[in-house]
Amino acid sequence: EVGSLSSVNELRSLIQLSALNFFVLNEEEIIGFIICFREGSEYHSPNYKFFSDCEDKFLYIDRVVIKKEYRRMGAGTSLYEHLSKVANLENLPICCEVNTNPINQISLNFHSKNKYIKVGQGYFDDHSVAYLKRK
């Protein structure tokens, strides 16, 4: 599951446009990754735009992917801990969105546990999201 991406080329383009991306390994296997953008990017996501309109400097999480059989085993926490260290170097808030319709309760719980607070709501034709931020 990589959100609304339709091809490997689209993922490659997203990575090239991103400001920060890294992955987590289990031995030699990539089991997860995160893709992030900074302010001022050419990225045209409406969710990214929400934060662009209200934050001067920020780190936006666009994608987090953990291979299904490795979920709830600490891989996501590891990615977020590393991301927090990077953000702290420049005192950047970390921003993201989580689906609220259909609800992604696991992700909402994860972000709440990691001190993300709701700063807005986005409504779209086929879904809605909560905008979250961690200082």
Identify the role of each PLM range.
Residues 121-135:
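C-terminal "cap" of GNAT-fold acetyltransferases
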Residues 100-120:
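Conserved active-site alpha-helix within GNAT-family acetyltransferase domains
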Residues 35-63:
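Conserved acyl-donor/pantetheine-binding loop and adjacent beta-alpha core of acyl/acetyltransferases
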Residues 66, 72-85:
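Conserved acetyl-CoA-binding loop-helix of GNAT-fold acetyltransferases
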Residues 14-23, 32, 37-41, 60:
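A short helix-loop-beta-strand connector motif used in the catalytic cores of GNAT acetyltransferases and
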Residues 87-100:
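Conserved GNAT acetyl-CoA-binding A-motif
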Residues 62-71, 100-101:
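A short, internal acetyl-CoA/4′-phosphopantetheine-binding micro-motif in the GNAT/acyltransferase core
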Residues 1-27:
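Active-site rim helix/loop that mediates acceptor-substrate recognition in acyltransferases
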